[in-house]
């Protein structure tokens, strides 16, 4: 059997969909599972166990210049890549017009079908064409976690039952990032810094300002971690985030700033940390998928939809929610509980 997953973006949504691959392979061990995704997120999929083929696209860029010769050439190449195989099932797990169009372009086997969601779920995007262009539109419970939504849709479409807990299937190689370290005078030097059992990564970057945690809170938490014997490592994905990372690191006794690096290398670094503290962002969700001890911070009450499953992780991964933002003390207490659970 050949299956195609269409989940193009964003990073967090792609990560939340990863367990579908393992669910399908558990039900159909000889299945070929392919995935269409935005090119910038493809490095994460390259680390997924059992995924046969990654089909990258750049719809975000192409739609800005579709009528140029270069874009049209790239679009034709993408279509040729997409239509190389005929699929027994095409799963539109995104529920947007763009994903519906991609799913419609995929070729089917004689008995093949396209599946999609029939309705919106709370807090997630949905556009009606996704159900119009599918052979089968599956009704979803409106109040559902992002991970559970994709798993349920695929299971109902393909007729199998999945286990209660999600297996994200990430297989990560060791990674030693070049980092910036700050001494007491504020001078910067580059070092080869392999994360260790005493490294805690901070993931402060997010695409939404209302999800950010105050800079002073990061500094205060970092100081507590330093006092407890932990080094702090700071990730970033843009010049603005890099500046914030450097500002936090400069105020800590033991901190490093990782360089801008591909997502698979970020995942490799996170996998070797003692734990991660991060806001609701794609990189934080990678930490969850890696089963790294994790405290995820929420200024908005959406942890029920995107946060880690504290029960499945046996307390190794938790969410902390408060408005306008979680306090340093609350996050510190959560971290201590996570450490106790992880080392107990």
Predicted regions and their residues:
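Catalytic machinery of carbohydrate-active enzymes
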Residues: 1-344
């Amino acid at each position: 059997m050949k299956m195609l997953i269409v989940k193009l973006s964003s990073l967090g949504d792609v990560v939340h969909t990863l367990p579908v691959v393992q669910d399908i392979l558990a039900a159909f061990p000889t299945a070929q599972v392919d995935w269409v995704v935005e090119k910038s997120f493809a490095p994460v999929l390259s680390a997924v166990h059992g995924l046969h083929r990654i089909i990258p696209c750049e719809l975000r860029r192409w739609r800005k210049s579709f009528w140029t010769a270069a874009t049209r050439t790239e679009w034709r190449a993408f279509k040729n890549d997409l239509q190389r195989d005929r699929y027994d099932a095409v799963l539109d797990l995104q529920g947007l017009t763009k994903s519906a169009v991609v799913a419609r372009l995929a070729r089917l086997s004689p008995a093949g079908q396209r599946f999609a969601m029939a309705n919106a779920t709370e807090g997630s995007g949905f556009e009606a064409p996704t159900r119009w262009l599918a052979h089968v539109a599956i009704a979803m419970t409106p109040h559902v976690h992002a991970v559970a939504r994709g798993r349920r849709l695929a299971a109902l479409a393909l007729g199998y039952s999945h286990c209660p807990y999600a297996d994200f299937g990430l297989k990560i190689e060791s990674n030693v990032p070049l980092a910036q370290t700050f001494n007491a005078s504020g001078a910067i030097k580059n070092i080869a810094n392999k994360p260790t059992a005493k490294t805690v990564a901070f993931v402060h970057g997010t695409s939404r300002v209302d999800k950010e945690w105050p800079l002073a809170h990061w500094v205060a938490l970092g100081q507590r971690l330093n006092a407890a014997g932990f080094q702090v490592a700071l990730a970033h994905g843009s010049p603005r985030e890099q500046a914030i990372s450097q500002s936090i690191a400069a105020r800590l006794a033991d901190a490093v700033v990782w360089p801008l690096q591909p997502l698979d290398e970020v995942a490799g670094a996170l996998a070797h940390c003692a734990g991660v503290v991060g806001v609701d962002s794609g990189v934080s969700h990678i930490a969850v998928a890696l089963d790294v001890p994790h405290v995820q911070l929420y200024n908005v009450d959406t942890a029920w939809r995107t946060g880690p499953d504290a029960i499945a992780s046996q307390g190794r991964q938790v969410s902390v929610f408060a408005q306008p933002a979680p306090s340093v003390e609350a996050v510190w207490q959560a971290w201590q509980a996570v450490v106790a659970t992880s080392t107990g």
